[in-house]
Structures are given as C-alpha cells and as structure tokens.
C-alpha cells in the first residue's frame, strides 16, 4: 500500500516554564570565538580560532589566545554564521516552480507550475488537492502561503494565492488526479519557466507510453532529483490519505536515478519534466520500498490529464 507524498508532519512542543533570568541570558548565545583543531602540516596540528564579530579581529582577546597557544594558531574571520536553508524551503519572491507552498492549515508541499484559464488573464498556481485544498476540507478563497506553514509561512504576510478550484478526492470508485489550483495574488512577481540548473520549462511534452525515459523534478524537500520511468498506465494503486485509502488509475511510476530516491515527503505537487524540460506529470504519492536501487517509488499523474480536467493551460 502506498501513501500520498506526505506533507511534513508538524511536531508540537510543550510550553516551557522558566524562572527569572537576566535578559542577556534569555536572548541566547553571543558571537565571539569558535575554537577547534586545524591542520598545520601532514602530521602537525594547531588551534583553530574562528572570529565571529568584526570588532574582535584585532582585539586583545585574539592576542591573548595567540600567546596562550604559543603561536600555534590558525585565526580566521568568519563573521555571522546562519542556518543553511535550501532556497525551495525559504520565502522566495518571485515565486518559482519547486518552492514550498501549502494551504494555511497544511504543513508543506510543492508549487508545481503556473497555469491559466483558457478565457482568463489571472494566473493560477498548480499543485495537489492535499497540498492546496487540505484533502477536500478547504473552501474556495482560502489562503495559500509560501513558504508552507511547516517552513514558517504565515497566513497574511506570506499569503500568495487564494484557493480557486480542486478536483475532489473520492473515497469510493476510482480517482485519476490529485490536483488543485489557487489564484495568484495580483501584482505578485513570478517566473513560470525557471527550472534552476535544468534550464527553462519548454512547454508540455508527449504522453509517456514507454518505460526507461529520463525525468526530473524540483521539490520542496529533495530539490532537484533525477529519475526514470518504470511503469505507466498503473491501475488499482491504493494510496493512503488522511481521509482513508483511495484508489487511483492510469498513473505513472518513477524510480530515482543512481542511489537516491526520486521524491520524499513534502515533494507533493512537484512538476515532473522529461529530458527536454517539457512538463509530463504531476507528482502526488510515493513509498519507501521498491525500485532497483531500493529507495522507493514515486507516482505521478500525466500532466495532460491534469490540465484537461482543470481546464487550464501552462503559462509560458
């Protein structure tokens, strides 16, 4: 049994009670010196001193450390050190394919593409129902935020779109898509074709009708991943959702290239492209087992079917 490509689960921490402390202590650690061991030669080492504040570079403290270590020091100014957050999990403007996005009550999924109604000028963002519409629970007009709430996105300041339409997920019978669109906020900048190191989106590709084809995607969790098609027209695929086990027909199966998985939780909604950077599918589910590399399999819906059902075209 397969599960939807889960949006990241939110872990809740209990409130901490603390006794009165100096404000300085409550504000956290101060940037001074980081100390470690650096190599001097093949068999010799010295003290590594990393200065984290500009005004401390020529201070008496550095001179004192130098003296205490008898000159066996490697002093370098490194400045402020910040957490490393991938661009696709950060707040990004203009909006791009592959960014973290979600309904304000969902954790985080992926912005798949920019689309437009055939008779309208408004631009819509495309992703999964379970990313933008909270598995049928959302209402038209609900806020969509970038980044998703799990990545610190907040309703209001990070709202970028309003839910426009979703294809209902059915508990009985067959599902053929997990898809939704949200209307982009007016005057919000976006780049509908940027695929980072892959180049530029080159429209919509031909329907996948054979195995072995090379594909790629940019997703909220794993970023750029390469893969290959291992099956198509997959029927009776049972996918686990919060609302139950749902059946999907006529889907595409993909495995990761080399030793990596093609997708992980949070990559839901990713646009999958072929080796000519043409859109071919919309990612929606995956599992941890299977594949020739043992890293799991990913499932996606042919993009033509998604666009047809939602009555939209890709923005190029």
Where are these regions (language model features)?
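Noncatalytic regulatory segments and standalone regulatory/sensor domains
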Residues: 1-115, 123
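Residues that cap or initiate secondary-structure elements
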Residues: 41, 53-57, 119, 131, ...
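Structured catalytic/translocation cores of nucleotide/phosphate-coupled proteins
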Residues: 41-45, 51-56, 121, 271-278, ...
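Surface-exposed flexible segments
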Residues: 57-70, 193-206, 296-299
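Generic alpha-helical propensity signal that fires on short helical segments
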Residues: 65-67, 141-143, 200, 233, ...
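Serine endopeptidase catalytic core focused on the charge-relay Asp
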Residues: 91-257, 273-275, 284
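C-terminal subregion of chymotrypsin/trypsin-like serine protease catalytic domains
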Residues: 253-254, 261-262, 273-316
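Short, small/polar residue-rich loop motifs at catalytic or cofactor-binding pockets
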Residues: 264-268
